[in-house]
Amino acid sequence: MNKTYNYAVNTAASITQINVGLEQEKILIIDDFMESPEALVDIAASLPFTQYKTQYPGIKSPAPTEYTQQLLRAVVPIIEKHYELPPRSGLECTNCSFSLVTLAENDLNLIQRSPHRDASYPYQFAVLLYLCNSDHGGTAFYRHNLTQ
């Protein structure tokens, strides 16, 4: 018998907007997004992970379809509102994975140490859901020195 997981979004989650860089790029931070984030940790712990075939410094496993669908239903209206997109804008998920950095900082190659851009399309968004506390890192935003 398959175990059922709670993928429900916390309706009391707080949304904070910050603006970064010279262009004041809008970033949304949603704290306490999931009602039961431990369910995702349990799922991730039970999945087979493989080395990613790009410069990603770790391993990945596809997220469950049910979770991906729930995530999309929850974040699309938030993105549409805060980025002033038309309702039912057609945003879709292209990839949803559990990811775990496994290389130590000293083992990273030059490309893995460099800041990167996820995409340059105006209506492509990255959604990151951290399942660990801040002791395990986070995300930072940088600007290339020559463009300052």
Model-derived regions: residue spans:
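Fe(II)/2-oxoglutarate oxygenase catalytic core
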Residues: 1-148
